[in-house]
UniProtKB/Swiss-Prot annotation:
Gene: rplT
PANTHER family per record: 39S RIBOSOMAL PROTEIN L20 (PTHR10986)
Cystines in this chain: none
Protein source organism: Streptomyces griseus subsp. griseus (strain JCM 4626 / CBS 651.72 / NBRC 13350 / KCC S-0626 / ISP 5235)
Function: Binds directly to 23S ribosomal RNA and is necessary for the in vitro assembly process of the 50S ribosomal subunit. It is not involved in the protein synthesizing functions of that subunit.
Protein name: Large ribosomal subunit protein bL20
Amino acid sequence: MARVKRAVNAHKKRRAILEAASGYRGQRSRLYRKAKEQVTHSLVYNYNDRKKRKGDFRQLWIQRINAAARQNGMTYNRLIQGLKAANIEVDRKILAELAVNDANAFAALVEVAQKALPSDVNAPKAA
C-alpha cells in the first residue's frame, strides 16, 4: 500500500481555521488549537443569534407600535385586539413601519380598531 502524505491537507485545514480567526484577539488568532475552539464557538453563537434576531425584531416592532398607539390614545394590547375584531390582518412589521413612516395611516388603523372594539372590552361576545 502506498504511503499517504497528509502535510498539504493538514496545512490547508489549519490555514483555513487561522484565516477564519484572523480578527480575534491574542492567542485566538495565532495558535491553531485556541483558534479552532474560538471559531467553533463563534459558529455556534452565529447560529443561535440568527434565531434570536427574529425575537429581537419582534420586540422592537411591538415597542414602536405601542409608542405610536399611545400617542393616538390607545394601548398596544387594545390595538391588536381591535384589529383582530375588525378582521384586519396586518403583521407587526408593517404596523411598526406605518407607525414610524406614515403616522396618518397608522392613526386611521387605530381609529378602525377603536370602532371595532366593544364598549366594554371584557364583556362576553354576543353569540
